[in-house]
Amino acid sequence: MPIPTLAEKLAWLKPSPATPYEKHCAAKVPQGDYEIGVQVTNDILDEAMEVFIRSSRSYFGVSGDSMVALFTAGGDLINASCGTYLHAIIQPIVIKFILKYYEKNPGIRDGDIWYTNDALYGGIHNPDQVALMPVFHKGQLLAWASAALHTTETGAIEPGGMPVSAKSRFEEGLNLPPIKIGENFEIRNDFLEFYSVYGLRAPAMFISDLRARCTTADRVRVRVLELVEKRGPGFVVGLMRKMCETAEAGALKKIKALPDGKFRAVVFNDAIGWTPALVRACFLTLTKSGSRITFNFEGTSPENPSSYNVHPQAVVGHIANFMYEYIFHDLPIASSTFAPIDFEFPEGIILNPDKMAATSCCVFIGMQCRNATHNAFAKMMFSSAALWRQVTAAPGSQHTSQICAGHSQWNLAVSDVLSFSLNTQGQGARSSQDGMDAYGFAWCAFGRAPDSE
């Protein structure tokens, strides 16, 4: 069973080297056409996000706590429309896994629909599920499209997808490695039947959100092919490669402007699941040198027999939430922005547990990694006369998920999380400015608050 190793995952986070064909195509894209092309990808993804919101059933789907993304043929992220940045940097792991292990059997073909939610293979936790579609033009693989969303039911030992009492992955319900769930642009009925068994507490919502992901990814595919028909495949390939290079150059410039040094931050949890416990949820040593940053988590507490463990790429996802909201706020959402950033995870810590570990409540530990990152960058930036005014306090843990299960007023089965209470939480203050009482969600800066009544 080729579960990707930590080394593979961290390598797949980085952009792949440009192929000779990509370099040739990128050199032919004029600057004016490049700027227009970038905006076209923005429009494609924003339209697909609107489709996603309107076709989803779960609260998080309707709220826009989701992401729609476009990738190169090799799996590198080049742009996205985000309610949340949580999935932004890590989805290339899934695509590159498919390319490495499944290219020949079962094969990658036009009209395929791939699906996954397993954190062992590059996800966050099993409620966060993603549909992916390859974009082919006359037999040539040009790109990939994806749609990711948290669906609050997985058939676990508790309703709501994040069982607090789970002690291993075998109590968390659906954990699906990357699998082909559709061919010839149709979802397979046998998979829908298999999938719905895990969503028996709320089957209509479960299946509706799956279909919403698939139709959203397909909308991106269709619009990209329209651009190909208008400008040619070479232009699209060159545009995406140039977007990768431009994003990386911007990230290098921003990182280089930060002060060099070592900056530490430690964040504790006072409980693990139902058990009071003092846990060093994140011990971060952040080293900034020139145009590179290294995150080292030596000193973090060991993994524990609960669902409060985090696989390494999920930690990176939480860090991406901070980076894109604050440091890279004006850069494209692209794999190449993380090219100058390295991660070191000691084996056996709560942020790099055994493959059997439960991780369904990983977000509550992952958020502490985001808070530690926030605090470390605050120390770094506060030492700079040019940057100290931009320092913002971390949003805190925001551990107030309200999960419910039962029957709606229409007597339909429901298992969901009430997103309106999450998407209206507070944001930290600056040194010269108050915080915000109702800013958004620490995991989703742009989510809505529907059905608050």
Description of each model-found segment:
Residues 2-110, 115-137, 141-453:
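Glycine/proline-enriched, intrinsically flexible loops and inter-domain linkers
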